[in-house]
Amino acid sequence: MDNKYEERLGTASMLPLILKMALPGFAAQLINLLYSIVDRVFIGHIEHIGTDALAGIGVTSSIIILISAFSQIVGGGGAPLASIALGKGDRERAHSILGNGFSLLVLFTVVTSGITYIFMEPLLRLIGASDATIGYATDYLSVYLTGTLFVMFATGLNSFINAQGRPGISMIAVIIGAILNIGLDPLFIYVFGMGVTGAALATVISQAVSAFIIVGFLVSDKATLKIKPKYLKPDIKIIGSLFALGIAPFIMASTESLVGFVLNGSLSGYGDIYVSTLTVMQSAMQFAAVPLSGFAQGFVPIVSYNYGKGNTDRVRLCFKYSVIIMFSFFALTNLFMITFPEFVAGMFTDDTALIKTVGRMMPLFLTGMTIFGLQRTCQSMFVALGQAKISLFIALLRKVILLIPLALILPNFLGVKGVYLAESVADATSAICCTTIFALTFRKILKKREQT
């Protein structure tokens, strides 16, 4: 088998390699973001019901994020382990990691979708759905859950394509699905008059197409890492390794859901318009966060592969370029949204009151995210280097240790503004802490690898 795609991770010029590996993931995640953003844009502009429907979809996002988070155990934990195994020349272990990951995704689908179906309405009420929004929330989520397996495959297996140096394939899968979603949304929502149900159906169909492309590649002869029947049998040691490293990406994603529970619950007491405001602002925040997640998926295989081979100079160089790119993008994107909040809000709604509310709250909500690019880079580096414990702590720090308590405490002193301000304070504090931890440990980690 021709391993040129794998070998270039250890030999190609670094900056062009990072761009070649990361930009497809960046573009793919930016386009993938359209799955949720386009739904919200079209739903928010439905005449007469747009604001309530938007709040209903915002409530479901906490559950959807939690379900999708389980795929990060496989994608976020398994792909770096597979890259390290490839770097060490251990192909047998790399194949086994992928096979066990595939089996876990099927198990996660059955468990998460089943539990959600059974307890759907109580969960939505708990998160903050009101009498005015519960119908839209259940309509959307009921359809979305039928495509859980497709979402798991599309998000959990994509990283294994990047791990073997083929980011273009994963980008194609996401782009095709996203373009299909953009076309189906207005057709189902407006032409067929299906409303929020149509938006969910468009997403399910689009994710199914992406999943078929990804799985199709991973079972083909073009793949270095392949899904093979003999590797689907659970291996307790490998599954343990997946959980050990993947628990940090899982917590990063799942605590986003927990944050949604807390924020939506707090805001529901002030009125549905504040829940809709949060939905708009979180969507805007994703314009910076989600594409950079795709960028990180591109440079993580480079770091993992070279760390496995002991090429620590290339690890350092990859970090240098990556942190500059990620910090700059995060800062510029957030500054734009803070400066023009009402313009951003107008993308999602025609409701004047909602646009003005977003205009007041957006600076409070996003200011701390301006330096978050530092944390996102350092956190991804820890995952790439197999530092599960540090990654786990950082994942817990921002959302569980800082954001959730702040979101519960600050409103007692600042009212509804305190709910939004909690995000900025937590983001800035955790970014500073994470960068400090990375500065103190990075050299030690690489030095230890050089001595083995």
Give short role names for the model-derived ranges.
Residues 75, 144-162, 170-178, 199-214, ...:
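Short runs within selected transmembrane alpha-helices of multi-pass transporters and secretion channels
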Residues 37-41, 114, 122, 156-160, ...:
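Alpha-helical transmembrane segments of multipass membrane proteins
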Residues 20-39, 143, 177, 206-210, ...:
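Transmembrane helical elements of multi-pass membrane transporters/channels
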Residues 40, 51-54, 91, 120, ...:
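Membrane-helix interface/capping residues of multi-pass secondary transporters
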Residues 1-22, 82-149, 191-247, 303-368, ...:
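Short alpha-helical transmembrane segments in multi-pass integral membrane proteins
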Residues 11, 15-34, 38, 63-70, ...:
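Residue-level signal for short hydrophobic patches within transmembrane helices
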Residues 54-114, 151-170, 264, 277-335, ...:
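Small-residue-rich hydrophobic transmembrane alpha-helices
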Residues 30, 34-55, 124-131, 187-194, ...:
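Helix-terminus/linker motif at the lipid-water interface of multi-pass membrane proteins
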